[in-house]
Amino acid sequence: MTLSFITRWRDELPETYTALSPTPLNNARLIWHNTELANTLSIPSSLFKNGAGVWGGETLLPGMSPLAQVYSGHQFGVWAGQLGDGRGILLGEQLLADGTTMDWHLKGAGLTPYSRMGDGRAVLRSTIRESLASEAMHYLGIPTTRALSIVTSDSPVYRETVEPGAMLMRVAPSHLRFGHFEHFYYRREPDKVRQLADFAIRHYWSHLEDDEDKYRLWFNDVVARTASLIAQWQTVGFAHGVMNTDNMSLLGLTLDYGPFGFLNDYEPGFICNHSDHQGRYSFDNQPAVALWILQRLAQTLSPFVAVDALNEALDSYQQVLLTHYGQRMRQKLGFMTEQKEDNALLNELFSLMARERSDYTRTFRMLSLTEQHSAASPLRDEFIDRAAFDDWFARYRGRLQQDEVSDSERQQLMQSVNPALVLRNWLAQRAIEAAEKGDMTELHRLHEALRNPFSDRDDDYVSRPPDWGKRLEVSCSS
């Protein structure tokens, strides 16, 4: 089957990119590809059998027209000016059979006009982390970009140490970022901001294109998508680590996996990025930061969208987030209905978990085994203050009995939303260290495991992290 690529971005947004081709690596070789995703995209298996090829930027497929996008942004709350694709190149937009499209974005593809002081490269460590994280999030049901392939090489890349150069093929319906809009707003070119909005609506919100109120309705949906995404992050204990405006997707996708981390111990102020000295992007601050980012986007739209309409949409953010968050947390607790004591029970559990530094994922998974008429719980042994747990657990079982559903029905629901497996940093690190020595077994094994996060397991993927893995520090270095 011949893949079809189109050039909407190149043709319709001529001032938002520089056309250029990837710069191949030395002795590049394909070490992993996503068979399931490749099948979904109707990619012939033969493309993965002839060396690095397109996956290493050595060849282009018919119809591809590679380019690097320009955008700007706020980083750690401070205006950073022009940024752009400093190491990534959009190879093309694949047109799928259903009429939708998928960007093919090659990360680590070499120098671009937007590399600033960088070398345009990515390292094996960061490409493995992004591939694992994006696939883990996908199978958790959270909107995200996807990983299609990883290529490693003999090219040395200099970070804190010398690391192997690598490339990641990332795919997504769009790489539209909040920072694209900021770029032209701060250049005082509101007509180009509007052009971006029209492009987004035409291709991703086409049902609004003929509505006279399209900009307001579109921004309302961007707010809602962002609120929903952040709510989902919070329910699985995911910290992004670097929520700059240029790292946020207009479509509400999780984008740019750098110094991310999933909670081990329940620590509301968890900081996963060791460069985040002020805790701006701490786990518990993500909802507030996302609203701040939406406010920055609203500012760029203010020349052609009524400020009252923008503020009305922004005012809806908290309620949308709380609604999504509340629904999912009730499911995680096994509540089939909404009762007035639900929030108090959840907050009391969180207080107990924070005090005891309980493992976030394990606590909710073990809670899924609760039998409403039995005071016995395997979760009890996870707490030192047994009396405090017993008191909370008795009230929790009383709340379960209000819903009048069987244990099996409730447990099935809970186990479908409380994963047994999340991508803890130590699991990724173990796969990385093996891969850097030439052994890809753990990389493939972990990828396979992450496809079934809600299945019961009895291996170390679902055990408590070892001491060395609890406080792994991760930087933006990639």
Swiss-Prot record:
Assigned keywords, A-Z: ATP-binding, Magnesium, Manganese, Metal-binding, Nucleotide-binding, Nucleotidyltransferase, Transferase
E.C. code: 2.7.7.-, 2.7.7.108
Keyword Secreted: no
Cofactor section: Mg(2+); Mn(2+)
Top-tier EC class: transferase
Swiss-Prot/TrEMBL catalytic activity: L-seryl-[protein] + ATP = 3-O-(5'-adenylyl)-L-seryl-[protein] + diphosphate; L-threonyl-[protein] + ATP = 3-O-(5'-adenylyl)-L-threonyl-[protein] + diphosphate; L-tyrosyl-[protein] + ATP = O-(5'-adenylyl)-L-tyrosyl-[protein] + diphosphate; L-histidyl-[protein] + UTP = N(tele)-(5'-uridylyl)-L-histidyl-[protein] + diphosphate
Molecular function in Gene Ontology: AMPylase activity; ATP binding; magnesium ion binding
Binding residues annotated for Mg(2+), in chain numbering: N247, D256
Family matches, as InterPro entries: adnlytase_SelO, SelO
Binding residues annotated for ATP, in chain numbering: G84, G86, R87, K107, D119, G120, R170, R177, D256
List of catalytic residues: D246
Family of the protein in this entry: Belongs to the SELO family.
Function: Nucleotidyltransferase involved in the post-translational modification of proteins. It can catalyze the addition of adenosine monophosphate (AMP) or uridine monophosphate (UMP) to a protein, resulting in modifications known as AMPylation and UMPylation.
Protein name per the record: Protein nucleotidyltransferase YdiU
